[in-house]
Amino acid sequence: MASLSDRLDRVLGATAADALDEQFGMRTVDDLLRHYPRSYVEGAARVGIGDARPEAGEHITIVDVITDTYSFPMKKKPNRKCLRITVGGGRNKVTATFFNADYIMRDLTKHTKVMLSGEVGYYKGAMQLTHPAFLILDSPDGKNHGTRSLKSIADASKAISGELVVEEFERRFFPIYPASTKVQSWDIFKCVRQVLDVLDRVDDPLPAELRAKHGLIPEDEALRAIHLAESQSLRERARERLTFDEAVGLQWALVARRHGELSESGPSAAWKSNGLAAELLRRLPFELTAGQREVLDVLSDGLAANRPLNRLLQGEVGSGKTIVAVLAMLQMVDAGYQCALLAPTEVLAAQHLRSIRDVLGPLAMGGQLGGAENATRVALLTGSMTAGQKKQVRAEIASGQVGIVIGTHALLQEAVDFHNLGMVVVDEQHRFGVEQRDQLRAKAPAGITPHLLVMTATPIPRTVALTVYGDLETSTLRELPLGRQPIATNVIFVKDKPAWLDRAWRRIIEEAAAGRQAYVVAPRIDESDDTDVQGGVRPSATAEGLFSRLRSAELAELRLALMHGRLSADDKDAAMAAFRAGEVDVLVCTTVIEVGVDVPNATVMLVMDADRFGISQLHQLRGRIGRGEHPSVCLLASWVPPDTPAGQRLRAVAGTMDGFALADLDLKERKEGDVLGRNQSGKAITLRLLSLAEHEEYIVAARDFCIEAYKNPTDPALALMAARFTSTDRIEYLDKS
């Protein structure tokens, strides 16, 4: 007998287990049984002459005679052969290709009747199967020959003719699994049946009252029904239970991480009424909003505790997150600690340095003429600095002269040593992973875990906050400071109203004549950046192409500058400095300006091919304007028809400035895998059944259960549920994205 935690090689043997591990990363019985079917076939119906052509990706079964065969060497292994066979003829002619085919060429010969089963594809209108499962029918020796999985079913049927074998397949119910050319759906089904035949009854890790509350069937019944139940209603109930399991596994992983951090010692730093933080509050030329004061109080209390703070601060573009973070960092500096602010780009890091020095004034001039008596110093460390500059900044960090250091990934290098690191602030968290923020926290003194504040201007739906950022407490700033100007957003459907695009260029000229500035944003840098070009789809605008055209055509009378991610750091700094100083009227750019760029005089943004951007991305871009004293306008130009899904998305962005509402819409539009990102090895982190957009009730209930259950963790089955979210040699932590 077997349990869920048993290794597959003990149950299936080394050959099958190794194949499942290599193709899908399955190592335990639990791994295999949670590889759920993606569809079901009520009898393996044959594709015949009168049938409608199946869709690409559909699982089909074909019974026909081989009319042609062709063998050829494999490209990477010339000593091995590939075999291509053709079955049937006319409209439903199908070709099937087999790799490493030396061992099957004697079976798959011309005029042989064969059953093929696999996913159909198309090439130039012709149906194709790639390494399908096969079974030879009516072989001369009377024995069944073919793929092991189909052969075992045929042997078990004890049919005495090929037609009776086919009838057996047509009678039976089969699940269809996500598969590969090396391990096909039939192979997986055979392994699943073999495992379920010897699986001990699975004890349920969820209490009966929780199952009853949500109408969930027992774990043992669900794991068997999802694979074997012929009743659709029972399979649906199994999916509901296993979806809840996934929510529990995910939350257990996050709660475990959170508890691990809470057991560590944090640097206690109480608020000082005579410190730098209090002095900055007195000097600010504006009043904090009620929301900012509330968040600052929460942060201040957390920093004063002897446990590390782990908090996510999210807020609308321009809601004032940075000043709250600066006040929190100064509270740590007042207690003798250093703070590190990690930014995803050099442009954003330089912007933070400038704005923090500006707001601190003499409070950031420690050791300098004109500096306040208890002033600190603020430094910048980026990869593009010269070796001498980096060496000097590293020395100042190591000596403790610098209280706040702002940097990019350069802060993570081994050469960077802190004198007394007490707090890490990560801006735009979605650009970093858990490993990177932990790498920076590890630079603190032995026995101390620095406080962590993660900031994002990308509003996060509740279900994402409970999953991707589930190991962090959450604070939200919704209120915008007084003085923020309204931003009118309009969609230009160029095919319908080409004159509107001409009017957009004139609007930019008018704003420049009034002394104001504009952004023109493109989705690509140049023609070599073809990530969004598809057959039959109009290529999108490029920053370099627009820059070249506009300065000699529509905007020839204005001063233009170009900025994108492939420019050198010096060129980017020069373009940004000229734009900030008012020496440039229009900045033609890519999304390199998506976060952190603050030019109050910019009042117009024209986004070309806006349908190529995500909903949240457009909202972020729009936040670069409306920062000064003048009303602003954002124009979204697109060549898609208004009534398409892409056109409707653009209208949704234009219809609201509520980033949280747009974030919910963005989540519904995207796949969960896109939300969760990829792990460090590049494998997509996806949810199998759980939907962040549809299963909020399950996620909240699972979180509440895990928080309570973790106080006295006794059932190892809960940790097993969480294994694929925590196992460092497979998926890594879920939020390492």
UniProtKB/Swiss-Prot annotation:
Catalytic activity: Couples ATP hydrolysis with the unwinding of duplex DNA at the replication fork by translocating in the 5'-3' direction. This creates two antiparallel DNA single strands (ssDNA). The leading ssDNA polymer is the template for DNA polymerase III holoenzyme which synthesizes a continuous strand; Couples ATP hydrolysis with the unwinding of duplex DNA by translocating in the 3'-5' direction; ATP + H2O = ADP + phosphate + H(+)
Annotated Helicase ATP-binding domain residues: 302-477
EC number: 5.6.2.3, 5.6.2.4
UniProt GO BP: DNA recombination; DNA repair
Domain named Helicase C-terminal: residues: 514-673
UniProt xrefs under InterPro entries: ATP-dep_DNA_helicase_RecG, DEAD/DEAH_box_helicase_dom, Helicase_ATP-bd, Helicase_C-like, NA-bd_OB-fold, P-loop_NTPase, RecG/Mfd, RecG_wedge
Family matches, as Pfam families: DEAD, Helicase_C, RecG_wedge
Motif DEAH box: positions: 397-400
Wedge domain as annotated region, ranges: 44-171
Keyword ATP-binding: yes
GO MF annotations, alphabetized: ATP binding; ATP hydrolysis activity; DNA binding; DNA helicase activity
Cofactors, names only: a divalent metal cation
Phenotype for residue 627 to A: Wild-type HJ DNA-binding, severely reduced ATPase and DNA unwinding activity, reduced ATP-binding
A GO cellular component entry from the record: plasma membrane
CDD domains reported in the protein's UniProt record: DEXHc_RecG, RecG_wedge_OBF
Miscellaneous section: Strain H37Ra is estimated to have about 3 RecG molecules per cell.
Record function comment: Plays a critical role in recombination and DNA repair. Helps process Holliday junction (HJ) intermediates to mature products by catalyzing branch migration. Has replication fork regression activity, able to displace proteins bound to DNA. An ATP-dependent helicase with a preference for HJ DNA, followed by lagging strand replication forks (RF). Has DNA helicase activity in both directions in vitro.
Family, similarity comment: Belongs to the helicase family. RecG subfamily.
The protein's name in its UniProt record: ATP-dependent DNA helicase RecG
Gene field: recG
